[in-house]
């Protein structure tokens, strides 16, 4: 029997989690010394590298002094809560990584709370102690207070602390005495984290994630809860709904470094990949052939936000994407459902080309849209809507805990902005020159808040939010106050026309771009919509007096990210998403029809 430790890494975005895991892999000799390791091995998805966040959870294992350490990477965002809960089910202990300057952040709370409820033993790593102005002692106190708040047990509160800098590759027990490697941390993991319990009996494995290989099809990944799984043995899959299916394991793989390694048996406590099964979902149990005993399935938080997805029916349909039809989008959404636990998809009112897609928040859904866009899909999405529930006859809506960290002089602005959106301030902490303000705010109020907060604080604010609970409906919230500027007809936008219209508002297009009638090309300074003709060229005739010819000076366009577009649009607008561009448009492109329907 090999000695095993299963450990989950918990950290806030950008606190150095992935870097630390990379260094652990170096220590476990997973890279040859000359091999290029361009940083972030775990954030292998392009989107993750660009945004600097972890979305999917990954498994890696290293060998340290004869013990196999399985390292599980968890996402830090509460939008990906479904991912977090799956991973923690496989671990026996957790590594809580905090920044020596910032201390524990709101999202860390979310994952830590789940970990402590599952009874995992924590090791606290205070990272980035080489930063100027860091305060490791205070941060340690903050972590201790946080654990007390989250009802940690006596045993969990007696946690070891390791100080160090993952970037510079050292860890030790005193932050004033840098060492030259991270051995201290690895030794602590083996000493403090309990080995998985060896349970004898019939085999049980709860499927906690899926892998896919074009060669063998779908692969089930999970931790052997009890007994031993063998290569080629007959097993029963118990589905979540109680049905059972007999099948056979073709191959078993364990995780070795970054890849898989074929093996003939896996003992309880180890994490493995099972190949050759068909028809299984996350949360199913693989159990004994003769007398199956399923494990309880994973409970995942319900979605709080939904969006309308539909096919692209704009005049520029099919010019840029490979997959544009409803069949393509339907297949892609079904594929996403297999591995994305917190997602729900329903057809919209008996139509075949519209779907209501629900998820954990704007970020969760925008990552899905962005991934589809990069794969060559064209689609349109509507304004994000909050999912209401009726509890004891009262209409309730999701409320989130919002934390904003800003320099002191902007604090009053922030409080004003959030309270206008029906937020209640719960606490305010002064941390040197910055303040930490906490609010309870309806999820509706968060849509579109980030852009305003960043503008009002000159880009200084750090904002994080997580779902708290459902509370009674708080009343109307005023949304964007400016109207849209809408293109009159299809054609190429000219600098001459844009220049003459610049006093009407700011534009989202550059001269030379193709536009179509009904596309939203800018933001009007007033609250009504304005139809403008940006395709009007200058008449080159001799009729007018020469000489009064001024050069057009066009202010550069406002560039918006996908999240900003989703938060910006109104209910009568769509965001059109194609692999090369993102446009906003009115749902009804025809101006006369739009006018008529407004009169009704």
Where are these regions (language model features)?
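P-loop NTPase switch module centered on the Walker A-proximal segment
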Residues: 1-104, 142, 210-213
């Amino acid at each position: 029997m090999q000695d095993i430790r299963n450990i989950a890494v918990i950290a806030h975005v950008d606190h150095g989690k992935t870097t630390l895991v990379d260094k652990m892999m170096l220590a476990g000799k997973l890279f040859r010394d000359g091999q290029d390791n361009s940083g972030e091995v775990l954030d292998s998805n392009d989107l993750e590298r660009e945004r600097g966040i972890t979305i999917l959870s990954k498994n890696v294992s290293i060998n340290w002094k004869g013990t196999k350490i399985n390292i599980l990477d968890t996402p830090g965002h509460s939008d990906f809560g479904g991912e977090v809960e799956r991973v923690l089910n496989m671990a026996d202990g957790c590594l809580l990584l905090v920044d020596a300057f910032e201390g524990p952040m709101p999202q860390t709370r979310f994952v830590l709370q789940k970990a402590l409820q599952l009874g995992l033993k924590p090791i606290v790593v205070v990272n980035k102690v080489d930063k100027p102005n860091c305060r490791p002692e205070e941060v340690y106190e903050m972590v201790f207070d946080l654990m007390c708040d989250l009802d940690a047990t006596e045993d969990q509160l007696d946690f070891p602390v390791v100080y160090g800098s993952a970037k510079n590759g050292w860890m030790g027990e005193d932050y004033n005495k840098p060492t030259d490697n991270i051995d201290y941390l690895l030794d602590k993991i083996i000493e403090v984290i309990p080995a998985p319990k060896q349970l004898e009996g019939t085999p049980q494995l709860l499927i906690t994630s899926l892998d896919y290989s074009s060669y063998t099809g779908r692969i089930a990944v999970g931790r052997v809860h009890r007994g031993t799984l063998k290569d080629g043995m007959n097993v029963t899959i118990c589905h979540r709904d109680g049905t059972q299916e007999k099948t056979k394991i073709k191959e078993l793989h364990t995780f070795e470094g970054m890849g898989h390694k074929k093996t003939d048996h896996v003992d309880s406590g180890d994490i493995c990949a099972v190949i050759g099964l068909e028809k299984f979902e996350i949360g199913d149990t693989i159990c004994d052939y003769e007398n199956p005993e399923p494990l309880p399935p994973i409970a995942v938080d319900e979605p709080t936000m939904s969006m309308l997805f539909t096919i692209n029916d704009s005049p520029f349909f099919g010019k840029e994407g490979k997959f544009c039809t409803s069949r393509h989008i339907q297949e892609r959404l079904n594929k996403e459902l297999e591995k994305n636990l917190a997602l729900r998809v329903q057809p919209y009112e008996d139509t075949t080309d519209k779907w209501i897609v629900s998820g954990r928040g704007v970020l969760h859904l925008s990552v899905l849209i962005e991934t589809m866009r990069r794969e060559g899909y064209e689609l349109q999405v509507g304004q994000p809507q909050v999912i209401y529930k009726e509890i004891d006859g009262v209409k309730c809506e999701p409320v989130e805990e919002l934390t904003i960290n800003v320099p002191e002089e902007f604090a009053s602005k922030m409080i004003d902005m959030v309270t206008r959106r029906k937020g209640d301030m719960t606490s305010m902490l002064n941390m040197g020159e910055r303040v930490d303000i906490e609010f309870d705010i309806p999820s509706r109020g968060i849509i579109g808040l980030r852009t305003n907060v960043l503008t009002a604080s000159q880009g200084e604010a750090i904002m994080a939010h997580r779902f708290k609970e459902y509370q009674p409906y708080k009343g109307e919230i005023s949304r964007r106050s400016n109207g849209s500027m809408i293109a009159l007809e299809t054609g190429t936008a000219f600098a001459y026309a844009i220049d003459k219209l610049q006093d009407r508002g700011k534009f989202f297009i550059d001269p030379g771009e193709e536009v179509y009638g009904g596309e939203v090309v800018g933001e009007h300074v007033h609250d009504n919509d304005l139809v403008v003709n940006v395709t009007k060229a200058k008449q080159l005739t001799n009729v007018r007096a020469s000489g009064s010819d001024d050069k057009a000076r066009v202010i550069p366009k406002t560039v918006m990210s996908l999240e900003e577009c989703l938060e910006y649009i109104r209910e009568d607008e769509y965001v059109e998403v194609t692999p090369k561009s993102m446009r906003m448009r009115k749902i009804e492109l025809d101006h006369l029809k739009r006018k008529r329907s407004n009169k009704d």
